[in-house]
Amino acid sequence: MIVPVPLGDRAYNVHIAPGLLARARTIIAPLTARRHVAVVTDSTVARHYLEPLRAALAAAGLSIQPVIVPPGEASKNWRTLETVVESLLGFGVERGDAVVALGGGVVGDLTGFAAAILRRGCKFVQIPTTLLAQVDSSVGGKTAINAHAGKNLVGAFHQPAAVLIDPDLLDTLPPRELRAGYAEVVKTALLGDAAFFDWCDANVAALLAGDTPARTHAIATSVAAKAAIVAADERETGDTRALLNLGHTFGHALEAQAGFSDRLLHGEAVAIGCALAFRFSAERGLCPSGDAVRVTEHLSRAGLPNHPRGIAATAAPLIAHMLQDKKMRSGTLPFVLASGIGHALVARDVPLGEVEAFLDRVLAEV
């Protein structure tokens, strides 16, 4: 299956198929001028998939030059970025070459940002190995590292030359990370596809249990939705792409409060953020309270957190993190809220005092 991302001279295809890693040479070989392919991955993914990728590319006469970074969100920093860039320069990577990102969202963000600044821009290919990366971060061209002030505050838009999604790579993913990735699937349904949310309700158990057709359908539906949004608003200059931030304003603040650590995975933060966005929308009279309850219950059934308890004692530190959000404009922070399941909207008239009061009420719950 191929999902096109139509962006003029930056257009590319997202290839989705079980077993695709073994056929990676057919997509990667035409994209690189050298016989050596630089591959950025992390030490966990390398143990499972570096050799299969090496074998797949060897069939086309290509060898790999690996750059292996530590796993986890903590690697999205200046130091690791410098390591990646200097390694790629040491390999002699040129503009006509394609660097491969083999890993989850952290590896994809690091590699994409390195490719964006290397020789003022070289090609890169995404081979996402987590559900979160397959359904969200590998598509759309957002690349970034974290700063002390907050998440994804240093980065660039740099579209990949191709994305290769193999659902079979999820077989080695720890259950917690699989569930965290599923949060982005749910987010896709919540922001614009009520029928897809119904499908998620009926198929979440099968997807998490390893059903390949269910996983492939969830991935393809999510990718197609994101591709359409990116094509309409590539650089988030309007409200269309901003809808993808459903759950992220709350979520990023929670991640920052948790120290960008394994204490709270990104997808878990998004799950809590989506639950909060629907509760807040219901309190403001935008959304039926029944929809907010349904979202919370679905996340619980998926084994995902839906409440910020244990992350912060009061709202004040979360609001402080929100003030560093990259979406801030003239001191105003837009929130993605909802009028119902499948109907997200951007609200630009939300006083932070109202948000703080809401969060304090939520955090006071036992």
Please name every model-derived segment:
Residues 1-98:
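ATP/NTP phosphate-donor binding region
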Residues 203-316:
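Active-site segments that bind and position negatively charged phosphate/pyrophosphate groups
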Residues 6, 32, 91-94, 117-119, ...:
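Solvent-exposed alpha-helices and their adjacent loops that cap or buttress functional pockets
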Residues 113-206:
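A glycine/threonine-rich phosphate-anchoring loop and its flanking beta-alpha core
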